[in-house]
């Protein structure tokens, strides 16, 4: 079978890469240990609901559903699996699951062993997870399996003339909860009709984050009564733009949470900033008020820090692509980003709603910021548009909960 051959080639490639690189080496080791973990830690008397996410982003989409089920149905235990180290390494101690491990490669032998040991009573695959052997085995055993926050496009293999056989895997799902009408219509063209348009659970997730945002006394003290600009996940090319403007505008304060927190990058930022600046890890209630720029030199705070800003900037738009715009928009503040945003649906929608703003360089940025700083009504209107966009698109979680039987 061609599919299995591709999987074995991929597995071989990862093992070879693991000889030279730490990330695939972690992956190989983690996949090898899965079966011992399941044998030793699975409670054979419990009923498990299994959630699978390829990586961290997909996990965050599934997280609202995990936490709702855990809250309303504590009689079930949660098994969370990841395919990549970038998800597993960050969330291996996630308290919302009873067991977190890797998902082994989709070979027939791995699949039989994994499903036998895990023995789930229900399964949720998040977004783009369509592992043929796993799905066929779960279907064969009569285990209801759902696709959550999935999205389909015409160029995917399922809708090509040569993908008819692979498209059969979509029929193994008990139901598909898709993000938009286009996905539902595409699936209908190949006869897949157990589909409901629910939207994207990421909107529910960022609302949860907003409601649970940490109080950060040092950031609050730093802000005081000043208009504060929060730059999240920034890269050097982003910082060249907004730091230049900040240096020339003493009426505003700046919080920078760089994407890469390294000594060399932090030194680069400090060299660019020409006003009093302090690192978060060195800040105290006494010295933080003397600074105009606060550099967040640790991880895990950004989603809570946006609440202290009047204007936000999301990095990556002058490089590989922008980062999470929803984490800022949920607080009802305008979101600025660079030009590499075309593949990010939320950014495109924010642009349409006038809550997001694209800048292609310093001149664009300066014109926009001058407008924000001189026109309070314009600033408030943009922030309201961003917040409304998130609120109006939330609700996927409730629709999913109504359609599953627990």
Positions of predicted regions on the chain:
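Nucleotide-activated sugar donor-binding and catalytic core shared by glycosyltransferases
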Residues: 1-406
């Amino acid at each position: 079978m061609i599919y299995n051959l591709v999987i074995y080639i991929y597995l071989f490639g990862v093992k070879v890469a693991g000889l030279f690189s730490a990330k695939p080496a972690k992956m190989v080791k983690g996949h090898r240990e899965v079966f011992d973990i399941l044998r030793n830690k699975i409670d054979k008397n419990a009923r498990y609901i299994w959630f699978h996410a390829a990586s961290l982003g997909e996990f965050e989409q599934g997280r609202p559903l995990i936490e709702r089920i855990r809250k309303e149905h504590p009689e079930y235990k949660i098994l969370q699996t990841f395919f990549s180290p970038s998800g597993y390494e960050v969330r291996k101690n996630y308290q919302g699951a009873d067991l977190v491990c890797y998902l082994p490669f989709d070979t027939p032998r791995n699949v039989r062993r994994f499903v036998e040991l895990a023995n789930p009573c229900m399964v949720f695959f998040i977004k783009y997870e369509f592992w043929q052997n796993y799905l066929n085995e779960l279907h064969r055993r009569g285990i209801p399996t759902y696709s959550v926050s999935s999205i389909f496009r015409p160029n995917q293999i399922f809708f090509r003339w040569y993908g008819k056989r692979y498209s059969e895997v979509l029929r193994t799902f008990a139901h598909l909860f898709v993000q938009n009408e286009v996905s539902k219509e595409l699936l209908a063209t190949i006869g897949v009709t157990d589909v409901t348009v629910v939207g994207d659970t990421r909107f529910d997730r960022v609302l949860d984050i907003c409601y649970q945002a940490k109080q950060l006394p040092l950031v609050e003290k730093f802000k005081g009564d000043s208009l504060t600009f929060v730059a999240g996940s920034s890269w050097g090319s982003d910082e060249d733009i907004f730091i230049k403007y900040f240096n020339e505008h003493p009426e505003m304060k700046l919080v920078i949470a760089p994407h890469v927190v390294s000594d060399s990058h932090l030194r680069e930022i400090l060299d660019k900033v020409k006003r009093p600046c302090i690192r978060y890890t060195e800040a105290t209630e006494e010295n933080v008020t003397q600074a105009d720029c606060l550099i967040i030199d640790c991880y895990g705070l950004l989603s809570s820090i946006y609440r202290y800003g009047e204007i936000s900037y999301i990095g990556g738009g002058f490089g590989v692509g922008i980062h999470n715009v929803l984490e800022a928009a949920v607080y009802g503040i305008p979101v600025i980003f660079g030009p590499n945003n075309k593949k990010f649906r939320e950014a495109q929608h924010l642009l349409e709603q006038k809550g997001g703003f694209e800048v292609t360089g310093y001149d664009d940025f300066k014109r926009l910021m001058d407008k924000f700083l001189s026109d309070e009504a314009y600033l408030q209107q943009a922030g309201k548009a961003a917040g409304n966009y998130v609120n109006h698109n939330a609700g996927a979680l409730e629709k999913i909960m109504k359609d599953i039987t627990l």
